[in-house]
């Protein structure tokens, strides 16, 4: 009982210790230093992308504490408030929304198995596997979701944040930072801005004239969509904060803006928060009091969820998908790969939390565009679902990854550059013919199959033009790829995609877009004020590639070539087969 206490085991200090790795963070360069080689591709590739610039005044507001309601199938429960919302959606046309369109072509009939997947996806017009999603900094798996029949609408809840959740504010980008996929800026127009805003003095290269009298183009509801610009003075690149007051003057932005400098437009009339709407209608109506029913109303989370329920498929994808593995993040959600239980096929699943969206109405684009416009050079969507408070989009999985990895770490020859441009222009020519503007063309949005085929993805921020709405005005996109007329807040059309494609060609030649060592706001000012950017390695390209680029990067959008015209350019005759891209993917994997 009182035996001798056991001798304490002595553990020696480490012997022959060598400190081989020391990792730190350079605050000036905003990047990690001394990373082991194995970690570099995991951390640097996503950490170097500049964050989107967001105006918090126009972030979709949420009304917590709404009563929970059961949604069955694909129909929403029609209480009084929801009935008004759904009636608005049914009567909505492209004039009032770029997402919900009455004139959308009907989705093609495709035979589906019980698990919701097409029976023969390879036989569709698409032609092959693709990739889903884009990079970003939002995370959060669904915690609750009903079965394939009944589905509970979850109330407000706190979700675990990703370890790398993106900040809403801007960041200065060093040379090795790349922007997230998604809309970076969208600036609402406060009412009462002085008309006839002139470009700043000392802009010898800007050929865009300002209208002497800018007529307001936006009513009390909806996104501004007519041709007359009424934005702030482009000369100062003054991006006003959203306000319902007509007396706030625009402020000149200096350096990296504050989080409230830039923000998205409200695209859908009934989904726009009141802070983003002007105080007075743009066009005076007939005399008489306004009907209170016509005033924009705040749409609760439950109402928005019920409206989204109408365009997605019923059921729960977890009933036929297994082994979800997160492979990336986008500006709207996370991207996972999953396995179809019955066949073992890999698919990509993009999960977007309705409560974490900068502009939740743009989620309709994630479903509608890929569903309605099918092409062999556009990523194919299989199904879409509401799982709890998340929109899940099931798409084909693209094993080759994004073009960004190739342009950053390898050098492409002209045969390979032409092959990428040909595929992208074939997709854009179809989309532009239908009045769809992508608005975020860049290497991040170009995805590759395992055999080198090129596909266009990331349709969450596209817009629709038509005879009713021939031009758009929202400031949406990634700064370094934006067209000058878009930055100048002039009305634009599909030609902004052509400019962005030209910047992507520079990416493929030089490895990065122009002004990439500048902060986003300064880069936008330089794009707006300067001559079209030139290649750094101009001496290394052929005259045909230079001539092709000169047709893309034209400051006057009226003189810029269309996608259909560019498909006839001699440079595209150099395009190699998809197999010519495979060595680049192999080289990137073995680096």
Curated annotation (Swiss-Prot):
Q: Which domain of life is it from?
A: Eukaryota
Activity control, per UniProt:
Inhibited by INKA1; which inhibits the serine/threonine-protein kinase activity by binding PAK4 in a substrate-like manner.
Name of protein = Serine/threonine-protein kinase PAK 4
Q: Where is the composition biased (Low complexity)?
A: 191-202, 242-260
Tell me the function of this protein. Serine/threonine-protein kinase that plays a role in a variety of different signaling pathways including cytoskeleton regulation, cell adhesion turnover, cell migration, growth, proliferation or cell survival. Activation by various effectors including growth factor receptors or active CDC42 and RAC1 results in a conformational change and a subsequent autophosphorylation on several serine and/or threonine residues. Phosphorylates and inactivates the protein phosphatase SSH1, leading to increased inhibitory phosphorylation of the actin binding/depolymerizing factor cofilin.
* UniProt family annotation: Belongs to the protein kinase superfamily. STE Ser/Thr protein kinase family. STE20 subfamily.
One molecular function GO term is: protein serine kinase activity
Q: What is the effect of changing residue 474 to E?
A: Approximately 3-fold increased autophosphorylation
A GO biological-process term = apoptotic process
